[in-house]
Amino acid sequence: MCASVKYNIRGPALIPRMKTKHRIYYITLFSIVLLGLIATGMFQFWPHSIESSNDWNVEKRSIRDVPVVRLPADSPIPERGDLSCRMHTCFDVYRCGFNPKNKIKVYIYALKKYVDDFGVSVSNTISREYNELLMAISDSDYYTDDINRACLFVPSIDVLNQNTLRIKETAQAMAQLSRWDRGTNHLLFNMLPGGPPDYNTALDVPRDRALLAGGGFSTWTYRQGYDVSIPVYSPLSAEVDLPEKGPGPRQYFLLSSQVGLHPEYREDLEALQVKHGESVLVLDKCTNLSEGVLSVRKRCHKHQVFDYPQVLQEATFCVVLRGARLGQAVLSDVLQAGCVPVVIADSYILPFSEVLDWKRASVVVPEEKMSDVYSILQSIPQRQIEEMQRQARWFWEAYFQSIKAIALATLQIINDRIYPYAAISYEEWNDPPAVKWGSVSNPLFLPLIPPQSQGFTAIVLTYDRVESLFRVITEVSKVPSLSKLLVVWNNQNKNPPEDSLWPKIRVPLKVVRTAENKLSNRFFPYDEIETEAVLAIDDDIIMLTSDELQFGYEVWREFPDRLVGYPGRLHLWDHEMNKWKYESEWTNEVSMVLTGAAFYHKYFNYLYTYKMPGDIKNWVDAHMNCEDIAMNFLVANVTGKAVIKVTPRKKFKCPECTAIDGLSLDQTHMVERSECINKFASVFGTMPLKVVEHRADPVLYKDDFPEKLKSFPNIGSL
């Protein structure tokens, strides 16, 4: 459209008036600019809050540029760490509130310089490692610069290395934090705890209820389910590039590379070397290196010099012994080399042991069994050793190789505690990428409730019933939780309708044309399926209401490993014929729900297409029947659980469809269905289907209650 323009034929008479208007315009503009400059200047010098975590950024981390806070000698000191703290006793989950993304929010305090009464600095300049840690948090989805939205608080006081700390004064500085509140919901990171002579296994700074992500916990100091055991970061991770080495036997069976070991430990190791010869290599610090050669990058055995950590890749097993501290950076080096760590450190809490299965990547040997370590390792099968080598490297890549990886893994563990229904599964924590099946998740290990925001993908299998197909699409599109609609066009002799003829719906609609007319096409793991939930529905199921479909989806969310559907069927044992029989009559029992209208997890599409036992898939395609029964067998066999029938509806025949249109009306159909059950039971070697005598209905179904107050008023009839 073009805007209409009107011209005034009395233009010359308006010239003096327009000059006056221009003069007023420029005077007004100048006044606004001047007022803006004055307001900006006043704001710069006017006292205002500086409590913004933007103030800890890189440009302001020099101690010379930050506010100075004087700590009087009598400043309050927090209590010692409360060893009885657990998440339900010392952590305030109500600060986290409802979060639709199931993500905690982390606030980083502004950087300040703390000094004592004599002006001596309490805290040193933030270390490079702590700077990287704060940067990792600030760049993550957990970060917030709004202190009022925060669930977790991280101080800008660096306590990674206790050797550099003034214990009392650091604790006093912690108590000055604006939201300290006895350390509730505060997280401290420490990798080198304790100091001479005791070398305690947890940070000695009094911290009251604060959570501690510590790098050297023992079973005596670790508050299980509250603290987080983290690795001691190895600087060599960033300095040395060790290409991944394939699993398998290596030059040395057992290697020790640590320096400064206790004499008794070294004697035991050297005794193993004498007993087992060249298969054991015990290295020590080099004493006669050329000038300029970094001793940290070299290890020696007698007069032979080895590059470190490269030498670790030449060993199958690498010893990780306790030093003055329980946690050792050598563990990270060993994992990077793909060497299986042999941890000999009684009571040591391995990093991220709350979620990582260390039995898959390491061998833990009691200190008293150190002399038997060689025979213990020899008893491990070679195939298991190779799997442990792969797992060791994977742990390093995912959780050890950078400060960022350590920080984010720590926050994820805490996040999983606060939102357990959305927690990362065991497989996601522990399985290397090669083991994971892309975006497919095993329903046996799903969170308690899948995220509702994802909704479901409806897959409609069709051939040429366009009119009823469009009616199904229109009805399904009314379901609030529908995310996408996928039409599987199974007719190779006829083109789908033109784009302009399809119903206009609120969600994406995609048509997939198949190469062959196979019933199994409905269960193919299409890339377009992005949701966990799938609704399989036939093109003649026009009777289901949006309330029925939405209720079915809600039930599936509670039971995501089940087949949740509408048409119920039963299998019976025919004593006269001595075989199984397919039953479609209404009874008190149900053992199958037909996938003409059923919800299931997309994982089962993968299993149906690639892992279906025997020749079942080909048999279904050849007979053009029973793909729904095959899916029932598959799900029941994997889960060991029964189907769930939802809503009372029992009639699903399309009133407009003729006998020619409806496959289920064929006279031989019932006989073939019985044959399918017997065929599948033979292939599976058992009868996995479970019989149940219940169904799921909305709570207020058939109650004398106003319809407008019911969540699902239109459940429909039989």
From Swiss-Prot:
Catalytic activity entry: 3-O-{[(1->4)-beta-D-GlcA-(1->4)-alpha-D-GlcNAc](n)-(1->4)-beta-D-GlcA-(1->3)-beta-D-Gal-(1->3)-beta-D-Gal-(1->4)-beta-D-Xyl}-L-seryl-[protein] + UDP-N-acetyl-alpha-D-glucosamine = 3-O-{alpha-D-GlcNAc-[(1->4)-beta-D-GlcA-(1->4)-alpha-D-GlcNAc](n)-(1->4)-beta-D-GlcA-(1->3)-beta-D-Gal-(1->3)-beta-D-Gal-(1->4)-beta-D-Xyl}-L-seryl-[protein] + UDP + H(+)
A Gene Ontology BP annotation from the UniProt entry: sulfation
Top-level division of the source organism's lineage: Eukaryota
Family assignment from sequence similarity: Belongs to the glycosyltransferase 47 family.
MF (Gene Ontology): glucuronosyl-N-acetylglucosaminyl-proteoglycan 4-alpha-N-acetylglucosaminyltransferase activity; glucuronosyltransferase activity; glycosyltransferase activity; heparan sulfate N-acetylglucosaminyltransferase activity; metal ion binding; N-acetylglucosaminyl-proteoglycan 4-beta-glucuronosyltransferase activity; protein heterodimerization activity
Protein residues bound to UDP-N-acetyl-alpha-D-glucosamine: 465, 490, 517, 522, 538-540, 627-628, 673
Subunit structure, as described in the record: Part of the heparan sulfate polymerase, a dimeric complex composed of EXT1 and EXT2. Could also form homooligomeric complexes. Interacts with NDST1. Interacts with GALNT5.
Cell location: Golgi apparatus membrane; Golgi apparatus, cis-Golgi network membrane; Endoplasmic reticulum membrane; Secreted
GO cellular component term of the entry, any: membrane
EC supergroup of this enzyme: transferase
Cofactor section: Mn(2+)
Binding site for UDP: 461, 465, 490, 517, 538-539
Lumenal topological domain residue ranges: 47-718
Protein name: Exostosin-2
Binding site for Mn(2+): 540
PTMs per UniProt: N-glycosylated at Asn-637.
Metabolic or biological pathway: Protein modification; protein glycosylation
Keywords, alphabetical: Disease variant, Disulfide bond, Endoplasmic reticulum, Epilepsy, Glycoprotein, Glycosyltransferase, Golgi apparatus, Hereditary multiple exostoses, Intellectual disability, Manganese, Membrane, Metal-binding, Secreted, Signal-anchor, Transferase, Transmembrane, Transmembrane helix, Tumor suppressor
Disulfide bonds, paired cysteine numbers: 85-90, 96-151, 286-300, 318-339, 626-676
Glycan-bearing residues: 288, 637
Transmembrane segments: 26-46
Residues noted as binding a protein in the record, renumbered to the chain: 582, 584, 651, 653
Membrane topology: Single-pass type II membrane protein
Organism, as annotated: Homo sapiens (Human)
Annotated disorder: Hereditary multiple exostoses 2: EXT is a genetically heterogeneous bone disorder caused by genes segregating on human chromosomes 8, 11, and 19 and designated EXT1, EXT2 and EXT3 respectively. EXT is a dominantly inherited skeletal disorder primarily affecting endochondral bone during growth. The disease is characterized by formation of numerous cartilage-capped, benign bone tumors (osteocartilaginous exostoses or osteochondromas) that are often accompanied by skeletal deformities and short stature. Seizures, scoliosis, and macrocephaly/microcephaly syndrome: An autosomal recessive syndrome characterized by seizures, intellectual disability, hypotonia, scoliosis, macrocephaly, hypertelorism and renal dysfunction.
Gene3D superfamilies: Spore Coat Polysaccharide Biosynthesis Protein SpsA, Chain A
Protein's job: Glycosyltransferase forming with EXT1 the heterodimeric heparan sulfate polymerase which catalyzes the elongation of the heparan sulfate glycan backbone. Glycan backbone extension consists in the alternating transfer of (1->4)-beta-D-GlcA and (1->4)-alpha-D-GlcNAc residues from their respective UDP-sugar donors.
